[in-house]
Amino acid sequence: MHYYVTDNRAACVPLNEIPTAGYAEFYEDLAERLADERYHIGHYFALPDGDVLRAYCLLLDDTEHRVLVASYAIGYYDTPLLPSLTARHPQVHPFEREITERYGVRFADMPWNKPLRFPFDRYNRSSSIDNYPFYTIEGASLHEVNVGPIHAGIIEPGAFRFICNGEQVLHLEIALGYQHRGVERTMTADDNVLR
């Protein structure tokens, strides 16, 4: 697969110079590179582009100190389930979750396909922080402790769900998103004075 390659991590990249691959090629190449510890994802996101949704991935090469940028395009309504990179590389989960949440793209075998931030312009408006699907475990000696939504001062407000067996915490799930500010929309707006 071809990438736009730069060693300047602060550079602007012309969108028309970023190579576009098919999803199958994108998936296989990224899965192979992420198996090598020298690579990790800097960002992976999608944006509407005419009648398609274009996803961009910034892959960081820690050995050669380069940024590799690639993309793929999928149709909004004719897209089948896409293989999930998260199933092979857990570091991808927040990126795939956001793409699902914002645009409704479905990834097969996604082990933790839950909302991430509840942006105002999300694909499924009926999904809200109030009906967040917390992880559950059944058992006579287990109990759940729900804390929040609270603001701890350092992090944004969130709800914390502990699953405990006596005093031992078996699982903690944190739901953030109470304070989503729509940064992506702000940065891509034509009238944005910050750009």
Residue ranges and their predicted role:
Residues 1-172:
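Terminal low-complexity/charged segments
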Residues 158-195:
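Function-dense linear segments that define catalytic or interfacial modules
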